[in-house]
Amino acid sequence: MDPFSQLSQLQQNLQAMTKTVAGLENDMLEVLKENTELKVENQLLREKISKLDANKEPAENKSQAGLKSLRNIYDSGYHICNMYYGSHRESGEDCMFCLDILDNFVNHGQKNRG
């Protein structure tokens, strides 16, 4: 192969490599752009999760306060069940309907935490 042909082929190879490098550069810019967008989206989602968690905590506290109120009413000798709500219980008498409500209230709260 003569030197002119070699130079011509080398020039063609160089042009092909230049196109390949330009393509890789464009691909890299797209990946970097997507990466930046995903980082921003990730940060926004983390902030939303933090807000949701912050809103969830007071609901759990309200739930515990509600359970405590029901327990106090029941321990004071009054029914909290639908059938006898507000009526006085005899001393030492347990109501299975009231106890069922308290038990479900406690179990429901534990499921939400798990």
UniProtKB/Swiss-Prot annotation:
Protein name, UniProt field: Replication initiation control protein YabA
Residues reported to bind Zn(2+): H79, C81, C95, C98
NCBIfam families: PRK13169.1-3
GO cellular component terms, A-Z: nucleoid
Cell cycle recorded as keyword: no
HAMAP family: YabA
Function: Involved in control of chromosome replication initiation. Inhibits the cooperative binding of DnaA to the oriC region, thus negatively regulating initiation of chromosome replication. Inhibits the ability of DnaA-ATP to form a helix on DNA; does not disassemble preformed DnaA-DNA helices. Decreases the residence time of DnaA on the chromosome at its binding sites (oriC, replication forks and promoter-binding sites). Tethers DnaA to the replication machinery via the DNA polymerase beta sliding clamp subunit (dnaN).
UniProt keywords, alphabetically: Cytoplasm, DNA replication, DNA replication inhibitor, Metal-binding, Zinc
Entries under InterPro entries matching the protein: YabA
Species this protein is from: Lactobacillus gasseri (strain ATCC 33323 / DSM 20243 / BCRC 14619 / CIP 102991 / JCM 1131 / KCTC 3163 / NCIMB 11718 / NCTC 13722 / AM63)
Recorded family membership: Belongs to the YabA family.
Any Pfam family the entry gives: YabA
Cofactors required: Zn(2+)
Record's subcellular location: Cytoplasm, Nucleoid
Cofactor binding note from Swiss-Prot or TrEMBL: Binds 1 zinc ion per subunit.
Quaternary structure and interacting proteins, as annotated: Homotetramer. Interacts with both DnaA and DnaN, acting as a bridge between these two proteins.
Example GO BP: DNA replication
Lineage: superkingdom: Bacteria
